[in-house]
Amino acid sequence: MAWRNQGITGSNNIPLGRRRFGGEDGPEEESRTATPASVGGDNGIKRGRSPVRADPPADGVKRRKKRNRWGDAQENKAAGLMGLPTMIMANFTNEQLEAYTLHLRIEEISQKLRINDVVPADGDRSPSPPPQYDNFGRRVNTREYRYRKRLEDERHKLVEKAMKTIPNYHPPSDYRRPTKTQEKVYVPVNDYPEINFIGLLIGPRGNTLKKMEAESGAKIAIRGKGSVKEGKGRSDAAHASNQEEDLHCLIMADTEEKVNKAKKLVHNVIETAASIPEGQNELKRNQLRELAALNGTLRDDENQACQNCGQIGHRKYDCPEQRNFTANIICRVCGNAGHMARDCPDRQRGSDWRNGGGYGGGRRAIGQGDAVDREMEQLMQELSGGAPGPDGQPPRRIEAGPDHGYDDRDVKPWQRGPPPSDVAPWQQRGRDNRSRDDYGSRDQGSAPPWAAQSRGGDYGYGSHAGGYGAPGAGAATSGAAPWHQQAPPPPPGGASAYGYGAYPGYGAAVPGMGAPGAPPGLSVPPPPPGMPSMYYGSGSPPPPPPGEGPPPPPPSELPPPPPPSA
């Protein structure tokens, strides 16, 4: 048959083995003599069968030679993995055993990466993740890529460890140090949804995250769900793929130490927030204090030293060592401790620091209450020009108001408030701040001034002669009003007295007090121009004041006054 003469049958290039049926017990000479003829008849074409029969083994048992399906052992790269020495023939210390294990594992990974034997068997593979594609539509998470990346990361960690433990260690020739090592630390937002882990990790103005990066030397980024606000996310596929994962911190560094240090810092923040209440979290309090300092609203009371003892943790008015009496003083303007009213920073501009009693006693001022109420009242007064106070009364001065005794003299009458009571001044008893020249003595109670007894040295109503109710007219002891009393008689010698001598009651001169004369040896000086009648010694009295009726006639008992002398 023609097909038997062909050296290659079909597309199979592997030569066929010798035939197993028939001719095995025949003479060997026939086969030997037929071999050259057949070879020569085919014009040098190699036959599919073996031309030389192997010699039988010494024990007479024929064995079939098994061929390796991968080729020769010298060319088989995978077969070299089985030749790695794993038997330990000497007594090694623990450090030597660890170094040998590192070296053996690094060599094994290097050979797998060299022959591209990275994908394990079907039974050892894990379920494949969903496919991911880059901007060009190429899949980035293929099976070969994922397993190669895993082996490269493992070899990088082992090489870093071997370079520290094994002296003069040289990594494999095909080893390339990666630019960065990254690792993910997941945040338990599902277990603690009420805790703001992102705010604690980032901090005010990102200072907490920057501090952790500076301390560890690694780059820390927050990725995953919830890391980017809605409407501010990027549209690229790589960023969109990170948004599908859970919230995590992506740590990137060039060495493993930096990554571990950054992981420790991130774990510390997460564990502290999850185990300690928010009010007792020191990190949260420091962040709030730092944010207040950045905004300019910080009042650092905790770290401020006490002005009394110098210790930190309390103010001077709460100091246990009471050595400074100023710390116990309470300001009556703002209600705070540690300063007087004259030094109060909340005192209104232009107001007096004294808070005298005066007549009015303790009248409520506008400034009483907390600082917010005082500022609001002051603002309303400045805007409206006279806003009512908290008690509905017209606004008054906080200190040195219209009812504060001697401070009332610099206040205009129309600026004075209503009187503190409806009782007449002469009916008020027990006024401590009266002078000795007021309206009568304390023991007279509610008696009017004209009914009060005259005291020595007083110069009120009825004190001087010629006035209303003068003692000479007997009106000091009567209870009638001066306008209901009879006119007193004129004093003798009224022509030389000052005032209206002919009209009693109009300021007659005091008895025994005449007009002063000229000094010895001098004449009476002339009166000033235009005022001849108002000068002492003037002969003619001034005309009576105009009125509705004529002046009363003089009493009939008394003689008429003498005519004026020329």
Swiss-Prot record:
In which residue ranges is the amino acid composition biased (Pro residues)? Answer: 517-531, 540-566
In terms of InterPro entries, this protein maps to: BBP-like (IPR045071), KH_1_KHDC4/BBP-like (IPR055256), KH_dom (IPR004087), KH_dom_type_1_sf (IPR036612), SF1-HH (IPR032570), SF1-HH_sf (IPR047086), Znf_CCHC (IPR001878), Znf_CCHC_sf (IPR036875)
* Any single GO BP term: regulation of mRNA splicing, via spliceosome
Q: Where is the composition biased (Polar residues)?
A: 1-14
All copies of the KH domain together span 186-266
The UniProt keyword set, sorted, is:
Metal-binding, mRNA processing, mRNA splicing, Nucleus, Repeat, RNA-binding, Spliceosome, Zinc, Zinc-finger
What this chain does, per the entry, is described as: Necessary for the splicing of pre-mRNA. Has a role in the recognition of the branch site (5'-UACUAAC-3'), the pyrimidine tract and the 3'-splice site at the 3'-end of introns.
Instruction: Please identify the protein, giving its name as recorded.
Output: Branchpoint-bridging protein
Protein source organism: Aspergillus fumigatus (strain ATCC MYA-4609 / CBS 101355 / FGSC A1100 / Af293)
